[in-house]
Amino acid sequence: MYKKQSGFSLVELVIVIVVVGLLAVAALPRFLDVTDEAKKASIEGVAGGYATGILSARAQWEAKARPSVVVGAERYNTVNYDGVDFWLTRSQDSSGADTDFRDGYPVALNSDNASFPSSLSDQNCIDLMENLLQNPPAVDTVSNASSNSNIKYSAQADGGNWTCTYVQQEGKSAHQFVYEVKTGRVTVTLQ
């Protein structure tokens, strides 16, 4: 009995591989564009959640009649937001001099009611991200983020300008958002 074989010939297989290759080349740029758009949407979502956390902490401070504590001879704003105590900005010091800050925006965690930060540190920025968001992405310093692929955002403080810059680490993008402590503003930069 003669058994007929069925299947692809070598020529048909080569043609299929070439066609699939051409389709892949045509689809790859679209796939990369979709991936970049997803990264942009991701950082915009995180920055939006962060800004909401900032405003929610400030609203809690207003709702609690602007609580403050005295440290030394100075009065500092503070609030318990979602079970965490925060130091907040103040527009005037105890003598009435302007501080160039707007009232009521989170600066750092208040762990002891005794030591308001004199400058902004990377750790303050990390603490803010981890405690203002309900489900924060993994965040660490720039040096730690470069060596750990599980870190999704690097945090860097600019103590002179009182800003926290958070850079998205996924795919080595340069997308970032900046929290301006003086004004409470959160600005996203997509690159």
Predicted segment positions?
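N-terminal single-pass transmembrane signal-anchor helix
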Residues: 2-42
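Intrinsically disordered, low-complexity regions enriched in Pro/Ser/Thr/Gly and acidic residues
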Residues: 75-191
